[in-house]
Design a protein with these regions (language model features):
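ATP-binding pocket architecture of kinase catalytic cores
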Residues: 2-6, 23, 27-158, 165-171, ...
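Short, non-transmembrane alpha-helical segments in secretory-pathway proteins
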Residues: 9-24
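Short, surface-exposed alpha-helical segments at coil->helix boundaries
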Residues: 10-14, 70, 238, 242
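Generic recognition of well-ordered alpha-helical segments
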Residues: 15, 71, 75, 129, ...
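Helix-rich C-terminal or lid/interface subdomains of diverse kinases
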Residues: 37, 125, 219-222, 230-300
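Active-site acidic catalytic loop and adjacent metal/ATP-binding pocket
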Residues: 37-44, 50, 87, 180-229
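Short glycine/proline-enriched coil/turn segments at helix->beta-strand junctions
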Residues: 45-48, 81, 209, 234-238, ...
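Helical cap/lid subdomains and adjacent loops of hydrolase enzymes that gate the active-site channel
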Residues: 146-185, 247, 253-257, 282
Length: 300
């Protein structure tokens, strides 16, 4: 648990939801364990989920951010070929819980793991259709906002140096430094396209081996078109990655940049969550291993 983590339990969540959303008074509420690190999630009846932010933040700024995310979720839901949650309510903080929270529609399915669909060309093809639909969304004059992943790779040098330092004894840091040196020197990405921005296993739902839904759509926004390619190394083995790359028609540069974003994300997971969240640390390790073993990117 982080030092700034805010406790939230079922009785507190139940009281807040029933007080602020009286029409849900009769709905059962239960906590949903997950590997997520940003929100505590509670199931509200059969059709909704409540997401309570876990870390200290300015309530007014967070409310504005959640409102922006709600708009992005609505836009994504209108473009996605698979179900994605929409926000149906914004809860207010009170003395029992100091931050705003959200009510969202519930999407059924099994949360993916790094290996669940690794050998599935059908799942890879589903991801292709999802990303193509996002890329076809009109930017309406928007561009990358400069925050987080999705812009210039060298902007992340300081963070990567921190990760390399903290990963000593956990990973083959000299080899990984060399790998980043190649990634950061890649040509700039193509024109921005609309991107989910965080296609990790925890945000992808599976049913019958197919993509059944995509979660956490609040970051739907313009970015480097290679950003959503991170799913290739977070989830897919080599044959399925080939299906994915060919389906998207990715150029070699776009593919390498996708690998770079997956690498940047994975390097922050292993050391940071080594003790607090083994599943997230494991995702980081498996992604790094896939990148190192990938003949198209690991031998840069």
């Amino acid at each position: 648990m982080r030092h700034d983590q805010i406790p939230i339990d079922v009785p507190t969540a139940q009281a807040l939801i029933r007080q602020q959303f009286p029409h849900l008074r009769s709905e059962p509420i239960r906590f949903l364990p997950s590997t997520g690190t940003v929100n505590a999630i509670f199931r509200v009846g059969d059709l909704l989920a409540a997401r309570f932010p876990l870390h200290e933040s300015d309530p007014a700024e967070l409310a504005e951010s959640l409102s922006t995310e709600a708009d992005a979720m609505g836009e994504l839901a209108g473009r996605s070929p698979v179900p994605t949650p929409t926000c149906v309510g914004l809860g207010r903080p009170d003395k029992s819980y100091p931050l705003p929270f959200t009510l969202q529609t519930w999407i059924p399915g099994h949360v993916a793991t790094p290996t669940m669909v690794s050998d599935s060309p059908k799942f890879a093809a589903d991801l292709v259709r999802f990303i193509q639909a996002l890329r076809a969304t009109d930017l309406d004059g928007r561009s990358f906002n400069g925050r987080g992943r999705g812009g210039a790779l060298p902007d992340h040098d300081e963070w990567m140096e921190h990760c390399f330092t903290r990963s000593a004894g956990l990973l083959d840091v000299p080899r990984l430094r060399w790998m980043w040196a190649g990634f950061r020197g890649l040509p700039a990405g193509g024109n921005d396209t609309m991107s989910h921005g965080d296609l990790t296993p925890a945000n992808l739902l599976v049913d019958g081996g197919r993509l059944a839904g995509v979660l956490d759509g609040g970051g739907f926004a313009p970015a480097d078109p290679s950003l959503d390619l991170v799913a290739a190394w977070h989830l897919l083995g080599r044959p399925a990655r080939t299906t994915f790359k060919e389906g998207l028609g990715s150029s070699d540069v776009e593919w390498q940049r996708g690998a770079a974003w997956a690498f940047q994300q994975a390097m922050g997971l292993v050391w940071y969550y080594q003790r607090s969240n083994p599943a997230m640390a494991g995702l980081g390790r498996s992604t790094v291993e896939r990148l190192l073993d990938d003949p198209e990117v690991g031998a840069r």
